[in-house]
Amino acid sequence: MFKKLIRYSNKIFDLFTIIALITDRRIRSQIPTVKIITAVIIMYFTNQGSLHGLSQEIAYKRLKGFLPSVSTIARSADSMDIGSIREVGQSIYKKARAAKMLAPCHGMWVGVVDDHEQATSSYCKCKYCKSRTVTRKDGVKDIQFYHQFVAFILAGPKVSFILDIEPVLPGEGEISSAYRLIERVCRNYPRAFSIVIGDGLYLKETVFKLLKAHRKYAIAVLKEERRQLFEEADRLSLLSEPKVYRKGRTYYRVWDHSISGCWDGYGRGVRVIVSEEATPVRAHSKDGKSFEEKVNRANRMWVTNLPRSEDPGSLKNTVSICHSRWQIENQCFNETVNIWSADHVYRHSKNAITAFLLLLFICVNIVGIFRIRNIKDRSIKTKIYLIRLVRSGFHTARKPLPTIPPIPI
């Protein structure tokens, strides 16, 4: 399975050709950067989890003369050109989009943006670490150092494609970093999406105006009850009848309000969508001897400048698009952390952390497309099982790695 993934990556995406464009700032380097990038990609494809895991495989397979040492990989990551790594991601996206490997989400191309804390430590730090003071149960205060980044993904029904990330620097908030990220993504992927969804922090006039300038629509969660938009939507919901429908096991009561004059910073009218959701579930009783029926209820509100359609199913589709925001939590953060060890710090420096994350997300995108488009064996039902097959295929390969074409090492 490892050889099959390597051949697929090079045949469809020219992966081991375009990574030759990645450079670093080492002076008089004896090992080409393409060898280092190849080693990192092999580490991610085989899900080693750390540079030490890769070093053990190198020693076991007797590849010390063909793959660089982990110390060389770490030093090179400090000076890798982040822009050229992003260009590799753009090339893979263009080939995937042209081959129709990606599909729209509920009929529209939807981008989702959110932040994630990668690592937290009380003693490991660098000058780009953010810090905070936490109080333990015994009252002792500790200083935590951590790295944080904002990610932008393209939501989809089967595959969520991770487009780009931006680190959150010390002294700035998530929105400042997200503003740079959204601006760069709109420039590098101008036709990749038409809607951008964010949580309650993105209900800012600066974000809505930026997306409007790039001819994109915005959707943000409305949570703050003190906002005039919240109060006006709550009042209008009492005066109008909702649209009632069922999707799956969930029952929906949805209101769609057009409100103007309640958001002075934005200066334009917006839509506020209110959704009351009830999902019946069967759960264990408190005594643990029987089951009981319960109803999980949730009230959600979103603000958007997406124009209203006269299609009766448009509101139902818009609510589904709003729910696609969870893909960045489930398929980006949770999956990459639990399966791909995305929270592991391979090298504690700002440039290295960003480089390793971008290369990881490139590999995650390729494996996701490979599983959906190329795997015909019905016994391979989960991504975890596929990754184990790839890793075992590399571990049991008899021939040395350089004989596996077309890796240029």
Can you name each region flagged by the protein language model?
Residues 217-325:
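An anionic, glycine-rich sequence signature occurring as long contiguous blocks
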Residues 74-157:
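Active-site-proximal, Lys/Arg-enriched surface segment
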Residues 133-192:
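Electropositive, glycine- and tryptophan-enriched low-complexity nucleic-acid-binding patches
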Residues 172-229:
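Domain-level cores of phosphate- or acyl-group-handling catalytic modules
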Residues 1-68:
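Gly/serine-rich nucleotide phosphate-binding loop at the start of the catalytic core
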